A protein has these predicted regions:
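Alpha-helix capping and helix-coil boundary motifs
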Residues: 67, 94, 123-126
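Short, loop-centered acidic/histidine patches that primarily coordinate divalent metals
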Residues: 60, 90-94, 112-114
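Conserved, mostly hydrophobic/aromatic
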Residues: 57, 92, 141
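Short active-site-adjacent structural elements
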Residues: 96-100
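Active-site micro-motifs of SAM-dependent methyltransferase domains
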Residues: 3, 95, 143
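Catalytic pocket-lining loop regions of alpha/beta-barrel enzymes
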Residues: 1-89
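Mid-to-C-terminal alpha-helical segments outside catalytic/metal-binding sites
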Residues: 84-86, 101-147
Length: 147
């Protein structure tokens, strides 16, 4: 629960509160997928994905409450903190099928733009950015969910 849930204290939505659970021996082997990019705590979610082997960060692009610029901002944050192998695309589409379609368009566009910036800044080469895009949009979910 978090952004968009009026009955939630957003301060309690910080994923760093999960550290005790993530460090518990009985949960270390269980994959944990942090949904909705932990918005507005994307950096913290990315940090958890970076330091815990079993934690992944889902980037949801169908949230109708966020505009393109904000989706691009949290995608940049996620790419700056989390390993590419721990990031996954999600449509977050609900109820109306068109939301999945709109999300797919926005998701590809935002991920492509953010990865393109990494190439422009010299932080990645084009083939690395293309491979990263494939991983985030498809490959990581296939591996994690054994599809």
């Amino acid at each position: 629960m978090g952004y968009g849930d009026a009955d939630t204290d957003l301060l309690l939505g910080n994923p760093l509160h999960l550290r005790a659970v993530l460090e518990a021996p009985e949960y270390r082997g269980m994959p944990v997928v942090l949904l909705h990019e932990c918005y507005p705590y994307t950096r913290q979610g990315g940090y958890l994905a970076a330091v815990y082997e079993n934690v992944y960060l889902d980037l949801s692009y169908g949230i109708p409450l966020l505009g393109y610029g904000e989706m691009l901002a949290f995608t940049r944050q996620a790419l700056g903190v989390a390993p590419i192998s721990k990031l996954m695309y999600s449509s977050d589409g609900i109820v109306v099928p068109e939301l999945h379609w709109m999300s797919a368009i926005d998701g590809r566009r935002v991920i492509g733009e953010a990865l393109g910036e990494l190439v422009a800044y010299g932080e990645a080469i084009l083939t690395e950015a293309e491979a990263a895009g494939e991983s985030v949009l498809r490959g990581n979910a296939i591996r994690l969910y054994r599809l």
